[in-house]
Amino acid sequence: MAKQEYKQLPKRAEVHSATEQFKDTIKTSLGLDLFKGLGLTIKEFFSPSVTIHYPMEQLPLSPRYRAVHNLQRLLDSGSERCIGCGLCEKICTSNCIRIITHKGEDNRKKIDSYTINLGRCIYCGLCAEVCPELAIVMGNRFENASTQRSQYGSKSEFLTSEQDAKNCSHAEFLGFGAVSPNYNERMQATPLDYVQEPSKEESKEETPTNPESNKGDENV
């Protein structure tokens, strides 16, 4: 292993006289670094404000935002979309979904109870991805603070009202590939945006010509 060599930096010259102290003070206080810091401060002072005064102001949420779940209904009849298959309960990684069903007179499953323990839910969205009927989707209601645990997870809290379903007033789930609102304004430039493609004239000038191939073409 090579031996490392350390060099001692020269010491700063000591200032003794009052004139030299005054010159050193002016040099350090009125140097270029001070003006750089002041320029940055003034620039940010007059720049537009980006602060959101929550809760009076709120940012638009993306359609892919994962918050408290919504149980959807059919738009025409207003009936519940959930068929009680239990796929959401089986795929739930935090084991927070509980479905109790029974067979009705038509041998179809009827839902007795559908609960989601929001205290254990990690909002991964797997239940919404696996649902074959789009009955459970991820909503955008994130203000769900409460002092009692019993207020979380009841079916009536998640289920869309029948009147909203018949009036088609509730929004359908746009899917996990939906774009966010104002995505053009929020899109930032990448390094590839600053690369300029060569024009056609420049590309023609840069293409090398092989004289031997031209001679062969003339002989033919």
UniProtKB/Swiss-Prot annotation:
Sequence positions that bind [4Fe-4S] cluster 1: C82, C85, C88, C131
Pfam families per UniProt: Fer4_7 (PF12838)
Protein name according to UniProt: NADH-quinone oxidoreductase subunit I
PROSITE patterns the UniProt entry points to: 4FE4S_FER_1, 4FE4S_FER_2
EC number(s) stated in the UniProt entry for this protein: 7.1.1.-
Principal location: membrane
GO biological processes: aerobic respiration
Cofactor(s) in the UniProt record: [4Fe-4S] cluster
InterPro entries: 4Fe4S_Fe-S-bd, 4Fe4S_Fe_S_CS, NADH_quinone_OxRdtase_chainI
Coiled coil location: none
Gene Ontology cellular component annotations, sorted alphabetically: plasma membrane
Membrane topology recorded in Swiss-Prot or TrEMBL: Peripheral membrane protein
Co-factor binding comment: Binds 2 [4Fe-4S] clusters per subunit.
Gene3D superfamilies, A to Z: 3.30.70.3270
Function, as annotated: NDH-1 shuttles electrons from NADH, via FMN and iron-sulfur (Fe-S) centers, to quinones in the respiratory chain. The immediate electron acceptor for the enzyme in this species is believed to be ubiquinone. Couples the redox reaction to proton translocation (for every two electrons transferred, four hydrogen ions are translocated across the cytoplasmic membrane), and thus conserves the redox energy in a proton gradient.
Protein's organism: Helicobacter pylori (strain Shi470)
Region feature Disordered, mapped onto this chain: 187-220
Subunit and interaction comment: NDH-1 is composed of 14 different subunits. Subunits NuoA, H, J, K, L, M, N constitute the membrane sector of the complex.
Domain 4Fe-4S ferredoxin-type: 71-102, 112-141
Basic and acidic residues composition bias: residue spans: 198-207
Domain of life where this protein originates: Bacteria
Keywords: 4Fe-4S, Cell inner membrane, Cell membrane, Iron, Iron-sulfur, Membrane, Metal-binding, NAD, Quinone, Repeat, Translocase, Ubiquinone
